[in-house]
Amino acid sequence: MMDNNEPISAEHGQAGENLAMNYLLEQGLTFIERNVRFKFGEIDLVMKNGKEWIFVEVKYRSKSQYGGAINALSSGQIKRLRRAAEHYMQLNNIDAICRFDLIAVDAGQIQWLPNAF
């Protein structure tokens, strides 16, 4: 049996991000950038809704056991994502409203939590 805490393969992570991105595009958001990496954190998806910038964390689980993807986000990950988003906005001279969304993908089912944290 696979331990739910094992890192998922990059291929599965990319598949989850593809599902999330396509879902958000269907909801009317605009894609800006993907997999923005800094030494202290990564942003899975950068999207926009009008003038609002949206930083999206995608959590993927092939099975919804052990609490599923929605419960896989730690306080440390939230802190790193916030720091990465702040740095991203500074680097790109963005002075706008932003929010942090979570997309949880469990066995192909998508849950979108706007303003998740």
From Swiss-Prot:
GO terms for molecular function: nucleic acid binding. CDD domains: PoNe_Nuclease (cd20736). InterPro entries: Restrct_endonuc-II-like (IPR011335), tRNA_endonuc-like_dom_sf (IPR011856), UPF0102_YraN-like (IPR003509). Gene3D superfamilies: 3.40.1350.10. It comes from the Bacteria. HAMAP family: UPF0102. PANTHER family: UPF0102 PROTEIN YRAN. Belongs to the UPF0102 family. This is UPF0102 protein Ssed_4252.
